[in-house]
């Protein structure tokens, strides 16, 4: 009589008890999120606003995509959620303002964070200033502050991955220019000047396309970054190289 073969879960699948517990946890998370205010729907995540344990919170949920294998989806979502939580913690340890992480729900790939109440995006602040003052001169102090913050971030070898003025907040009182960095979903750790240069190039492209006629503001930012970072020289050299590659691609089409 042949011995019975032990059955094992298919690659990437959870054993039955674990799968049931995971499904139950996801269901609880789904019920909780359904009672919150949806404030943003992106390609990779939904952002909700609500209360978590009595505190104003923002919840970022990386939802599954139907076109990916479930096991790959679970690994990718978990990895990006962990990366973002670690980046926020790394910022705060370095003295860079970022939301407090309240809780990480690995079952549903949800990140529960502090809501920066009363804040405005740097994008909205710049647009408002340009509308009222009709000149970028009033933004020089803001540019200097952004340069200092991003220099410190890069000196910690943290690459944001999606630097835009929408991913920077100003918390009240606005005139104090207290910048809070958010949305580290594409962040990673790297000491390479190339990666930091690309990070700055992404910001430059987003900045100048979103805020026309602010070239002098971005120049002030780079000057501040240069004087604030201990590693600025090779990074800015790489930024120039990345710009050149970008121009060549534009000419080729």
From Swiss-Prot:
Q: Which residues carry this modification: Phosphoserine?
A: 34
Would you say which domain of life the source belongs to?
Eukaryota
Name this protein carries in UniProt: EKC/KEOPS complex subunit TP53RK
Spans annotated as Disordered: 1-21
Q: What does this protein do?
A: Component of the EKC/KEOPS complex that is required for the formation of a threonylcarbamoyl group on adenosine at position 37 (t(6)A37) in tRNAs that read codons beginning with adenine. The complex is probably involved in the transfer of the threonylcarbamoyl moiety of threonylcarbamoyl-AMP (TC-AMP) to the N6 group of A37. TP53RK has ATPase activity in the context of the EKC/KEOPS complex and likely plays a supporting role to the catalytic subunit OSGEP. Atypical protein kinase that phosphorylates 'Ser-15' of p53/TP53 protein and may therefore participate in its activation.
Q: Which InterPro entries match?
A: Bud32, Kinase-like_dom_sf, Prot_kinase_dom, Tyr_kinase_AS
Q: Name one GO molecular function term.
A: hydrolase activity
User: PANTHER family in the record, alphabetically?
Assistant: EKC_KEOPS COMPLEX SUBUNIT TP53RK, NON-SPECIFIC SERINE/THREONINE PROTEIN KINASE
**Which ranges carry the Protein kinase domain?**
33-253
Q: Give me the residues that bind ATP, please.
A: 39-47, 60
Q: Which family does it belong to?
A: Belongs to the protein kinase superfamily. BUD32 family.
**In which organism is this protein found?**
Homo sapiens (Human)
Implicated in which disease? Galloway-Mowat syndrome 4: A form of Galloway-Mowat syndrome, a severe renal-neurological disease characterized by early-onset nephrotic syndrome associated with microcephaly, central nervous system abnormalities, developmental delays, and a propensity for seizures. Brain anomalies include gyration defects ranging from lissencephaly to pachygyria and polymicrogyria, and cerebellar hypoplasia. Most patients show facial dysmorphism characterized by a small, narrow forehead, large/floppy ears, deep-set eyes, hypertelorism and micrognathia.
């Amino acid at each position: 009589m042949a011995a019975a073969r032990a059955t094992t879960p298919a690659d990437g699948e959870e054993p039955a008890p674990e799968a049931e517990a995971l499904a139950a946890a996801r269901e609880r998370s789904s019920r909780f999120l359904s009672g919150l205010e949806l404030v943003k729907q992106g390609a990779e995540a939904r952002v909700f606003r609500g209360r978590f344990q009595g505190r104003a919170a923002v919840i970022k949920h990386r939802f599954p995509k139907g076109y990916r294998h479930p096991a790959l989806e679970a690994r990718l979502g978990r990895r990006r959620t962990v990366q973002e939580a670690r980046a926020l913690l790394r910022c705060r340890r370095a003295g860079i303002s970022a939301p407090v992480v309240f809780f990480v729900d690995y079952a549903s790939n949800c990140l529960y964070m502090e809501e920066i109440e009363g804040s405005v995006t740097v994008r909205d602040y710049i647009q408002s200033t340009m509308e009222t003052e009709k000149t970028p001169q009033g933004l020089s102090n803001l540019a200097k502050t952004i340069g200092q913050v991003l220099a410190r971030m890069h000196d910690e070898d943290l690459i944001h991955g999606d630097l835009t003025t929408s991913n920077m907040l100003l918390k009240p009182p606005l005139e104090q220019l207290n910048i809070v960095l958010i949305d580290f979903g594409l962040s990673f750790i790297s000491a390479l000047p190339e990666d930091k240069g690309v990070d700055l190039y992404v910001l430059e492209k987003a900045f100048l396309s979103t805020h026309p006629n602010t070239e002098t503001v971005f120049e002030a930012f780079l000057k501040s970054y240069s004087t604030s970072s201990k590693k600025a020289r090779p990074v800015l050299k790489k930024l120039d190289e990345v710009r050149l590659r970008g121009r060549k691609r534009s000419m080729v089409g």
